[in-house]
């Protein structure tokens, strides 16, 4: 199957996310504190859609080989095992009657190092990183709840342009479904 048309749609969405980030950064330069070697976002837990996983896999296979690839895959396996345990605990908590909001908040507080983060705290696939990573330092909304990077200077109670992550995930899901 030729994934190229779907990957192009994903790349267009990624570029749009980059443009939104830059507009917010230009409008609020004192609030957006993203900089090279700041890896706070590289420990956040989030899911990838099918199209994002395919895109990252394609770029990963094109860039890495041999021992370097093996080392990165081992880091990915370790992160995956940690995340699996966290998800399993979240499922048990849900079945035990813990409110879903509390579970999601607890998961949001967890920190797992991204396997693409190198020893210099730089992303080895930065140009091809997921959309969530591209938007992390600006105000976002997930399920109607506003979120910001803890290192940013956006103030609670003030109004800022906010990216609706649910809409972006909806578009990512649409592209992913087109693949099937």
Where are these regions (language model features)?
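Short loop/turn segments that flank or connect secondary-structure elements
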Residues: 1-180
């Amino acid at each position: 199957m030729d994934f190229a048309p779907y990957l192009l749609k994903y790349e267009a969405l990624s570029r749009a996310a980059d443009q939104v980030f830059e507009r917010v950064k230009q409008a609020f330069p004192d609030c957006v504190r993203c900089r090279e070697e700041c890896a706070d976002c590289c420990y956040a837990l989030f899911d990838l859609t099918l199209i994002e996983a395919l895109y990252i896999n394609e770029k990963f296979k094109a860039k890495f080989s041999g021992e370097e690839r093996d080392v990165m895959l081992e880091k990915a396996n370790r992160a995956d095992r940690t995340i699996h345990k966290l998800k399993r605990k979240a499922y048990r908590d849900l079945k035990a009657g813990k409110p879903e909001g509390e579970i999601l908040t607890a998961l949001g507080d967890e920190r797992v190092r991204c396997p693409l983060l190198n020893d210099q705290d730089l992303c080895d696939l930065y140009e091809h990183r997921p959309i969530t990573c591209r938007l992390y330092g600006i105000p976002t909304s997930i399920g109607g709840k506003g979120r910001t990077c803890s290192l940013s200077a956006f103030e609670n109670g003030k109004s800022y342009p906010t990216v609706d992550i649910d809409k972006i995930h909806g578009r990512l899901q649409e592209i992913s479904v087109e693949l099937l």
